[in-house]
């Protein structure tokens, strides 16, 4: 027999919320009648609860169709913000979602620097990063965890190194988030990306962009959404039902915490306890 380990299935809490939205809320949300208002409230609930779990502000979390598409939108925002000659660091430990879009910035006059893995271990070494890190670097992109060699990279240390030269960081958490929700506040990264369908949720990309950076990057949405952080990097309308259903991911964390531990704790603390169960 062959045992194949794939992504997580969607939890019942998400499925129930998705079903409820499609059968009771399938109208334009945020209107002034019951079904519309309830739909908007459920979308807001998902953002608020997931942001609390990850220890970030509510308006720092955005939803998109996938992590790959979120990254392409961010790359376009950086392309309109960076200057020719600015440097961007990418790795060969990343999968394409967090490297291809950034490498294309070379077509806009940015310098792309490669942080190569050790050829024997497949790991990213901090000394190798230090050798290519200077004040020309404006963005450092790297994975939280490699889905090939399984290395969990020291995110907080890498972020500190990047910040020391004035660069911001973009962490691909697609391979890490299935093992537990990240405490992004503690990690300190400027951008964190992962896919909710690999974390018991609907097929959405979840993108955290910290407030200061979000306000500096070029708006990618309609001009009338430019002042709304949760809309700046969502060029098209969101999938209302899937965004609302993402609150079921928080329901699932709460259910696991209540069953195994119980008692009072803030959302981020509950998520840390559930993550430790892995």
Regions found by a protein language model. Name each.
Residues 1, 5-278:
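Pyridoxal 5′-phosphate
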């Amino acid at each position: 027999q062959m045992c194949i380990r794939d992504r997580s299935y969607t939890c019942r809490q998400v499925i129930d919320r998705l079903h409820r939205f499609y059968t009771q809320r399938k109208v334009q949300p945020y209107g002034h009648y019951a079904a519309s208002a309830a739909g908007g409230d459920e979308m807001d609930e998902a953002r608020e609860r997931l942001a609390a779990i990850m220890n970030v502000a509510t308006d720092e979390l955005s939803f998109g169709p996938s992590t790959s598409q979120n990254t392409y939108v961010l790359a376009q925002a950086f392309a309109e913000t960076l200057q020719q000659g600015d440097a961007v660091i990418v790795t060969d430990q990343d999968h394409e979602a967090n490297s291809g879009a950034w490498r294309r910035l070379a077509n806009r006059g940015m310098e792309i620097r490669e942080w190569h893995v050790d050829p024997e271990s497949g790991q990213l070494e901090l000394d190798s990063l230090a050798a290519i890190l200077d004040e020309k670097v404006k963005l450092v992109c790297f994975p939280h965890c490699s889905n090939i060699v399984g290395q969990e990279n020291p995110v907080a240390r890498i972020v500190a190194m990047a910040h020391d030269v004035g660069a911001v960081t973009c962490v691909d958490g697609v391979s890490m988030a299935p093992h537990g929700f990240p405490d992004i506040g503690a990690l300190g990264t400027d951008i964190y990306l992962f896919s909710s369908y690999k974390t018991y949720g609907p097929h959405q990309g979840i993108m955290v962009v910290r407030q200061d950076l979000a306000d500096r990057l070029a708006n990618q949405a309609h001009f009338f959404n430019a002042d709304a952080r949760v809309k700046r990097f969502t060029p098209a309308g969101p999938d209302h039902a899937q965004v609302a259903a993402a609150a079921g991911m928080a329901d699932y964390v709460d259910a696991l915490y209540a069953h195994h531990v119980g008692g009072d704790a803030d959302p981020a603390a509950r998520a840390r306890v559930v993550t430790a169960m892995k």
